[in-house]
Amino acid sequence: MPLNNPITSALLADPEIIQQNRLPFHAHFADQTSPEMPLAVSLDGEWAFHYAENLTAPFSDWDTLTVPGFIQMQSLQKPGQPYGTPHYVNTQYPWDGHEKLHPGQIPQDYNPIGEYQRSFTLPESWASCYLRLNGADSAAAVWCNDVYIGYTEDTFTPAEFDMTAAVHPGENTLTVQVYRFSSGSWLEDQDFWRMSGLFRSVELFTKPEIHLEDVFVKQDFTPDFSSATVTFDCKVSGAGTISVVFDGEEQSAEVGEPAEYDSGVVFGKGEADPDVEEDVQDVSFTFTVEHPTLWSAEQPNLYEAEIALLNEGALVERTGLKVGLRKFELKERQMLLNGKRIVFKGVNRHEWSCRTGRTVSREEMLWDVKNLKAHNVNAVRTSHYPNDPYFLSLCDEYGLYVIGETNLETHGTWQKLGADGSDEWTLPGARPEWRENVLARAEAMLERDKNHPAILIWSCGNESHGGKTLWEMSEYFRNTDPSRLVHYEGIFWNREYPATSDMESQMYTPVADIKKFLAEHPEKPFIMCEYSHAMGNSCGGITDYTEYAYEEPLYQGGFIWEYMDHGIAVTSPDGKPGFAYGGDFGDRPTDREFCVDGLVLPDRRNTPKMDAVKAAYAPLKITLTDTEAVIENRNLFTDLNAYDLVFASSVNGKPERRAVLRADCKPGGTEHIPFPFALPEAGLACMTVTAIQRAALPGIPAGYEAALGQVWHNYAVARLTLPAPQLVEMDCNVGVKGEGFEYIFGRGKGLVSIRYNGVQLLDDTVRPNFWRAPTNNDEGCAEPFTFAFWKTAGLYARCDNLTAETKGDFVIARANYTLPDGQTLPIDFAIDGAGRCDITMTWQGTRTELPEFGLLFPLRRELTEVSYLGLGPRETTADRTAGGKMGAWNYNVRQDFAQNTPVYPQECGSRTGVYSATVTGSGLNIGIGFAGDGMTFSALPYTPHELENARHLYELPRDDNKTVVRCAAFQRGVGGDNSWGAKPHADACFAVEKGTSFRFTIQK
């Protein structure tokens, strides 16, 4: 504990004290070197660490922790979790219910302090020494050799301090205290795990005799983009020569006696360090580029720039920059990139790693960017804070549009239990004591990230209601950087300052309501900053949104919530690997599994939802008739001739013919291309057209399948007629048998046995099924309550009567089921001499909606290999068929479940549009086949009820007890407009009425 410690609870709680001695913000330099000496030294690695529960509590014994990293994530790996655990809440604050607090107060009983300490030796060549904390959650104070250096808030932007006066030759001691809660915690109520620590890199750096303090690259274009002017506005300290090389041209200037440094707006009350003030001179260089190569997500062209600083002719500092030339503007109520109407096909992305929390490795960031590009995503909203600068550099390089979002969310100060409860405590509003705290966050982000071409829009934050302060922030963005637009969704909640946002931005609005809004309010372009809530098995109806972007010019796309599940990798008490979510560490209050709401699993495995995203966000829309392909080029800058168009026909999944064509079609155009050969007329005849990228682009290899379209027809196949099988009627059972097959129906039970070639295939009785394991979306709109009857209807349906007779070439057994409410359901089993069993279930009751309508087959455990003809290769649903491809597919039941199931167990694994399926098993030499006319099929290790009863995958029974096959006329769509009340769209809500029937076949 440092002897000189000015940090008090009052200081931490004061919203007007957000920094002490912090240096002015500036652009991030990813590439700054010197031939004379290292300009920076990383302090990442092991640090000494100890911990206290609050400001007055004693510290623990010294331990070691890794920097960068979160205290609580590393605590999970230690016996007894001595430094606390992560705490997940969504809108409510983590202290809610523990202490009664209002803005301007912070927890007293539980406000942990983590004190980090390490030694360092100053390089002999350094005449100055500065410290950079790239991320400290939520506030930090710094000492060097027991000399107090300074204090900072704002978790997600860098804080720099001058330590020159405190360091000495030889070994020095650096101490950093990190406070879990501060005044900034009221402004950081994002929907994520609450933790603390030095979670981004820590480094020392020095400044040579002449040093580039800052640079802002600005650009302008002629109306036809034939010429660009590029200006480098530089701030330089010291005296000497500055040289800028850009596009093959070099310009230089002498920097002499500089004017006194004007640091611009420095928000926040605090003590000024007289030794921090520097002399800085402004220098600008302007270049003209003829016929510039423009930057976009499709073609992320970057120019190289180099800024060299020389002292008496000797190079002392070199800074490399990558510059993307592009123009983003609002014109005639539309957002344009390089003169073209843009459509955002985006995701919201929290920073997350299942083992290290928001400390994300460069390898993970690169994987994310490549994965997004591989699924046709073109935009990212950095929800809800500035992301690591390396991620933004990857977006520049690989081509992703970015909404850079200010580290601001005050959701819990105004939204109470889902309703607008704004009052005098709502932040920031127009409360003067919070103004500079809020505005400083905008300045920190803009200054750090202003040179990234990927950033098209600055966002004022998330879900912080409205008011004057947010409007002032938007004006700061516009005045400082007019090359970008400003976004803020909160004007939806508070229309007092509508000019805060240049666009109308909403969350989770149904398409029908968007249409209505734009009909009444066509003043601005419209985006969905959050839509298609991806929690659990979700994203149904996503194409309704993407298609509307090409129907309504004012609707310019949106950002799916969200990219990744925020699960934490854990080992269950019985040794099984799994993922934890809110509440699993005893953290209360909590919002439980609401943090596992992403398109990819916590370990970055893609879920089937990503297949739908890739299809919905495709750069081409390919629609097939029976004779031609209609291709709509939705690119902004890429001609259709950048793709090979592969036409392929198949019958029953087997390839027939193939041809590769090319066509010219400008961006925004439509091309009609006749089939090079006819669609077959036998079996399941399918024509598939795929667009294959010809040349490699950043993140996308040559040969990448960018889009596809299909058309298919199922032609009936004549059956071989054989004599009827043998009917065996006894007191308790009815048997039907023939060569190589036997079915047994139990009186009072139904179908109890299926034997093919003498092998028993059933593990239990076949029964009607009307239930699916509730999804998160089902629970959010109370469908388990609404449809509760259907859970018991299938479980407890009673076979009251069984009849059997021979009719022509068939034996027909009829099982008459009575449901718990007295309704009846006859199921006919018509078995021919080959052992094929045509099953027809017919609804006799009144019209009603229900989750599923079909039969459940509990098969023996060995039957785990599935081959099917339908949409695949992975799960599709009634409202999420986009991304499914008609064809012949194979999977292992247990592996498919393990790879694709949501963290929170629920319905999964269904295949739609299935015409046939076969389930086999090793060692049995036999299997069972299912055939239907585009039915819904699933094969899982569990029943819907077993899935429903577990909260984590490791709570499920063993996965090798049985295989549960379900064949259904339909299964209700999964929905996804939101997870707290929205039902699936009407075309995915199915009903039965008197006479509704479902027919399919089982066979060996």
Model region roles, listed by residue range:
Residues 3-8, 12-19, 30-34, 48-52, ...:
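Accessory beta-strand-rich segments of carbohydrate-active enzymes
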Residues 82-106, 153-155, 163, 167-227, ...:
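An acidic-aromatic loop/edge-strand motif
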Residues 2-35, 76-77, 89, 147, ...:
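Extended substrate-binding grooves/exosites of carbohydrate-active enzymes
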Residues 144, 227-270, 283, 305, ...:
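Beta-strand-rich binding/interaction modules
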Residues 116-118, 157-161, 281-287, 669-675, ...:
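Short strand-edge motifs at loop-to-beta-strand transitions and within beta-strands
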Residues 144-173, 177-191, 256-279, 284-295, ...:
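Beta-strand-rich ligand-recognition modules
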